Amino acid sequence: MGQKINPLGFRLGTTQNHHSVWFAQPKSYSEGLQEDQKIRDCIKNYVQKNKRIPLVEGIARIEIQKRIDLIQVIIYMGFPKLLIEDRPRGIEELQINLQKEFNSMNRKLNIAITRIAKPYGQPNILAEYIAGQLKSRVSFRKAMKKAIELTEQTDTKGIQVQIAGRIDGKEIARVEWIREGRVPLQTIRAKIDYCSYTVRTIYGVLGIKIWIFVDEE
């Protein structure tokens, strides 16, 4: 069996960038890492609670930049209206919540939202879409094909979608996948976006993996 490496970690420094940009002493590094995770979880929970459409979060990624006196959080969203339109003070509220959570009086916390032009070119948003379809008991093949149709509008060069688990409630778990175009996982200069997503259905847990071949550098 071939050993599968995470496509994002494999390309760090060439076509992929870090989502956390800061330096720390070895002693305090783990604290900084846990803090990042808490910030991401806090933002996701807030969006989950305050969104209009129940199945779409629309967060592609969250970047965190830290300086001595400032934590800058950039949320890349496919559908920022979900967060901004309903609550004009949504970002301020989120900022206050995070500030309370970390009671970091000596550090200012700043949140910015960046809109992604083609949200369905992002594997996280696509995985959420497929998860929503599976929860609504749409057949998995139909959900996968629809996801591929959505990416066709975004100028991607290839996509692979994989669903694993008790598909359609069958007794035996299996893996089903579908590929459209090229997905060169071994080419380091190929910019590949990847995401793995867990969805809880009434039959059990399903795993969704999506690889999107964006471009070659």
Swiss-Prot record:
Keyword terms: Chloroplast, Plastid, Ribonucleoprotein, Ribosomal protein, RNA-binding, rRNA-binding
The entry's localization annotation reads:
Plastid, Chloroplast
One GO term of the biological process aspect? translation
Superkingdom as given in the UniProt entry = Eukaryota
- Keyword Heme in the entry? The reply is no
Keyword presence, Protease: no
One Gene Ontology cellular component annotation held by this UniProt entry = chloroplast
- Predominantly, its location class is plastid
InterPro entries cross-referenced by the UniProt entry: KH_dom-like_a/b (IPR015946), KH_dom_type_2 (IPR004044), KH_sf_prok-type (IPR009019), Ribosomal_S3_C_sf (IPR036419), Ribosomal_uS3_bac-typ (IPR005704), Ribosomal_uS3_C (IPR001351), Ribosomal_uS3_CS (IPR018280)
Q: Where is the KH type-2 domain?
A: 43-117
One Gene Ontology MF term: rRNA binding
Please report which protein family the annotation says this sequence is part of.
Belongs to the universal ribosomal protein uS3 family.
Q: How does it assemble?
A: Part of the 30S ribosomal subunit.
NCBIfam families given in the database record: rpsC_bact (TIGR01009)
From the Swiss-Prot or TrEMBL record, give the protein name: Small ribosomal subunit protein uS3c
Q: Source species, please?
A: Platanus occidentalis (Sycamore)
The encoding gene: rps3
